[in-house]
């Protein structure tokens, strides 16, 4: 009989808990394990410490048996298996019944949770539960007689495949924004509901304008979907652990003091922090409540004296975390946030809240209590984005290990792919295994994009058993992957020719490479934004009437989110200048629908442009240092399209890759690496 089949012995568990002097009883442990199962990023058995520290072997065994038994009742991490099988039309019908009971004619179901983040825990996956759509951006609107699912161009095919198109209209949220659709679809005199925890004030006002055009009204309500989602997973309870100063490079006390002083200079008494990555950075803590990003879900209030109120479920704090946080950090239950906001409001002092990331509920609560709101960006955003020397040294080390893992994979791929038997999932699994063997590895930084042939042309493709292809000769294989290490976060893309590429593939690849090199070599004055640099990466494609429909670069955290603001390189307007210490991706691409995709991505860090030439210039200049290390496929390079400066850059980059990674890989891989990084035109 397996551990999953063994019914836990509550009496024995109670005895083991008492013997270990645990503060929990069996019911408390069961509730804790339910939260552990709802946390997708728990690694190993470190959660045992939440029960007893140290954990006696017999208790650890009992806890593992309990976890296995409870996990067997879950389906896809979303809900117990019996309810997960409830047909989605029935879910929609139940939601409509709940709307009628509340006197609502419609309800808005966004993809995000109360933190407005990219990754959402199982308990927050309302859109996926209702519609079946699992993409990273989308929104549904349910009316009495109609329902629509809004996605952007990346996800139209996926939405049509995952959602029931007999009940959900699939709409393009750029061509037809949801608020505009509501203006034509909401019933006159009707009431449309929204959950104020799940929308920013700006989003609410857009919906309000659409609803009022239809002669209807928009009301904040308790979420009716939560009422019909039976056996909804609990909030995740991944262990929250200290992030050592040896990796962070600055103590939490110093960060709190620095940011508190900045608030005081602005005449602000306190800032409400709603982004878990900001709180994790500020307090030097990490967790695992959401996929691929080491975040503990929480809220916080930072005051100008540097003190912090942290609103978090204490059950997930590992022993000793109180000492790490210090006396100036007060740990409060999540339900204490509302009263704390009331107290801030009644003090009469100015309270800073970020209108771009904070939930409408936060603003409503402060305003109802008479608060003076200062609308400004999260005070942690910019300091977090500008990495300190310790963080930069760490990310360089992480990129060396990550580059060695990817290079081992590429050498293995060169041997295996020509057989035509290797699948997309098998390839990504092998790459993950190489990464997991590396020091300080904690997780992937996002689901690997492993796309062969036409699947590579799907920008946010994710291989499934139903969609995956074999990686075969005459294909291009696009591999976009990354990892979370204690000392840094990585994200790198390589496009590999399987066999001999055709002339069109080489032309398009080389134009993408020219754009990548142009951005990597860019010198630009202080004050330059990513928007101003975006054309560097596109020029060679534009010359042939080609382009790509995604941004050129996104910010990256330090053992935090692989997508970090406020910096980015994109056509979209962005007023944030690039500053020294900011890490950003350099990832131009080209995609031929139904045929292949090409993307070349390295992470770079903004640095001062030093040297004699710099001293002679009238303005302070900046440049990029490339962090990512892995060969770029030379077989795809059309040498005649590169000028001498571009060839010199590629050869110098490959020399650096070879010299850095050779000591980190095995002999067979080293031989392959030597050939893969040989000077262009030498063979």
Residue positions per predicted region:
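Active-site neighborhoods and metal-handling regions in enzymes and metal-associated proteins
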Residues: 82-683
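Domain-length accessory/inserted modules outside core catalytic folds
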Residues: 1-80, 84
């Amino acid at each position: 009989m397996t551990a999953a089949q063994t019914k836990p012995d509550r009496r024995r568990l109670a005895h083991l808990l008492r013997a270990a002097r645990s503060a929990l009883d069996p019911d408390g442990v069961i509730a804790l394990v339910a939260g552990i199962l709802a946390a997708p990023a728990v690694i190993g058995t470190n959660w045992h410490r939440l029960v007893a520290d140290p954990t006696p072997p017999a208790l650890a065994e009992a806890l593992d048996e309990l976890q296995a038994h409870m996990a067997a009742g879950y389906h896809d991490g979303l809900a117990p298996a019996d309810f997960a099988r409830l047909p989605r039309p029935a879910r929609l019908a139940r939601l409509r019944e709940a709307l009628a009971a509340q006197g609502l004619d419609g309800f808005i179901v966004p993809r995000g949770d109360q933190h407005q983040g990219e990754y959402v825990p199982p308990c927050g996956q309302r859109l996926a539960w209702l519609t079946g759509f699992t993409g990273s951006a989308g929104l549904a609107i349910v009316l009495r007689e109609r329902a629509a699912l809004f996605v952007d161009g990346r996800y139209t095919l996926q939405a049509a495949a995952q959602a029931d198109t007999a009940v959900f209209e699939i709409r393009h949220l750029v061509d037809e924004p949801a608020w505009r659709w509501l203006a034509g679809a909401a019933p006159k005199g009707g009431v449309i509901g929204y959950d104020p925890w799940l929308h920013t004030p700006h989003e609410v006002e857009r919906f309000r304008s659409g609803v009022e055009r239809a002669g209807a009204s928009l009301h904040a309500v308790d979420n009716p979907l939560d009422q019909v989602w039976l056996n909804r997973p609990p909030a995740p309870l991944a262990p929250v652990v200290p992030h050592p100063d040896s990796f962070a490079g600055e103590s939490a006390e110093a960060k709190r003091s620095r940011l508190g002083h900045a608030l005081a200079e602005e005449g602000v008494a306190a800032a409400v922090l709603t982004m878990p990555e900001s709180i994790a950075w500020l307090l030097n803590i990490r967790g695992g409540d959401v996929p691929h990003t080491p975040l503990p879900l929480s809220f916080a209030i930072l005051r100008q004296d540097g003190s912090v109120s942290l609103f978090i479920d204490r059950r997930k704090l590992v022993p000793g975390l109180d000492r790490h946080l210090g006396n100036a950090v007060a740990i409060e239950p999540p339900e204490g946030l509302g009263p704390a906001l009331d107290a801030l409001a009644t003090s009469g002092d100015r309270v800073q809240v970020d209108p771009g990331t904070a939930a409408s509920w936060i603003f409503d609560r402060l305003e109802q209590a008479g608060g003076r709101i200062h609308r400004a960006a999260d005070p942690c955003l910019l300091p977090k984005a500008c990495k300190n020397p310790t963080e930069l040294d760490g990310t360089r080390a992480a990129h060396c290990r990550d580059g060695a893992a990817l290079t081992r994979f590429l050498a293995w791929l060169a041997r295996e792919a020509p057989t035509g038997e290797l699948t997309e999932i098998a390839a990504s699994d092998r790459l993950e295994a190489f990464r997991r063997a590396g020091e300080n590895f904690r997780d992937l930084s996002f689901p690997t994009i492993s796309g062969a042939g036409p699947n590579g042309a799907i920008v946010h493709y994710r291989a499934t058993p139903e969609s995956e292809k074999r990686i075969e000769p005459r294909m291009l294989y696009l591999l976009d992957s990354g990892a979370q290490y204690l000392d840094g976060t990585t994200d790198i893309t390589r496009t590999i020719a399987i066999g001999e590429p055709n002339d069109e593939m080489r032309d398009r690849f080389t134009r993408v490479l020219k754009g990548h090199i142009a951005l990597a070599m860019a010198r630009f004055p202080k004050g330059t934004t990513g928007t101003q640099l975006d054309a560097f990466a596109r020029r060679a494609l534009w010359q042939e009437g080609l382009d790509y429909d995604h941004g050129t670069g996104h910010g990256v955290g330090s053992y935090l989110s692989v997508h970090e603001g406020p910096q980015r390189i994109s056509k979209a307007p962005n007023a944030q200048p690039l500053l020294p210490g900011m890490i950003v991706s350099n990832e131009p691409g080209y995609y031929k629908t139904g045929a292949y995709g090409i993307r070349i991505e390295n992470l770079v860090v903004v640095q001062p442009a030093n040297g004699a030439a710099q001293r002679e210039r009238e303005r302070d200049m900046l440049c990029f240092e490339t962090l990512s290390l892995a060969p770029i496929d030379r077989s795809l390079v059309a040498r005649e399209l590169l000028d001498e400066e571009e060839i010199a850059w590629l050869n110098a980059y490959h020399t650096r890759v070879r010299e850095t990674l050779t000591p980190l890989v095995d002999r067979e891989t080293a031989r392959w690496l030597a050939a893969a990084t040989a000077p262009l035109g030498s063979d």
